[in-house]
């Protein structure tokens, strides 16, 4: 019988109405008791890591999660992480970079309604996640929700309240869990490299979303206080003329100091390509800017957090590692440009 470790972190799935709003109260051991049928499918053991609203998720907890999987990796056949939906995409992306080449599945799931509520989606999501974690062809970090199995680096929350809360961005859904069966859409290619854990990460990463009329002094502040800024630009990517002087003044100092600017787009689908327009092409070539292409923002942020800790001040090494595909995170990068 397969052994699955259920790791509780809180979220809506663990919440109860406390008079001043839903609050995580149920432990993972209590949650699994709502789906007693899974006890006949596998041996489930429980680890309660924390019990928080996922709005309060923090990189320190990602480190604790990754270390918990590392410590128990040889003891279990799969792992299921119970999590709130609001930051679930960040956590599934972070774990994808912190636990690479895992032949064992690490499934992140939760629900839009508490598990003790009538008509909740929690029981189905938990059952589907355990079924997927038991399967011999499952591996690496995935997010399972509303029957969809999404690569951990490609998930994004698209609905605030509906059960079909998550979509896979710029990459196909890996599989569906339906009526107790797993329907896979991609051919199975087993991991051949040994599992690697990168449990230490940097939180010196900031996202800066451009709006028409953005003030240059905001960039100066971010450049002074963070080691990496992910800039969400417009369309396929570019920097407004009003910001160019600030960017040019800062970039050389940044590279010398081992700091980084990564360009992304506010447009969710199809990704960036700074080579198309003048507002993007020149600054990218002048400074060999790192570009996010078709990655999700959650993947960009968490990948940078992991890489900053691994490569420190080496711009070339970090750029090379950023463009290296991890768990289907980037498909259209052209690092030679």
What feature does the model see in each segment?
Residues 81-104, 241-249, 280:
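Short Gly/Thr/Asp-enriched flexible loops that form oxyanion-binding sites at enzyme active sites
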Residues 108-178:
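Internal gly/pro-rich beta-alpha loop/helix module
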Residues 7-9, 81-83, 107-110, 142-146, ...:
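Short beta-strand segments
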Residues 92-123, 130-136, 254-265:
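Short, acidic/small-residue loops that bind anionic groups at enzyme active sites
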Residues 16-20, 92-93, 118-121, 151-157, ...:
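Short acidic, glycine/serine/threonine-rich loops at helix termini
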Residues 2, 7-11, 27-38, 151-243, ...:
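Accessory alpha-helical/coil subdomains and C-terminal extensions
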Residues 236-337:
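C-terminal non-catalytic interaction/assembly regions of soluble proteins
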Residues 1-71, 269:
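ATP/NTP phosphate-donor binding region
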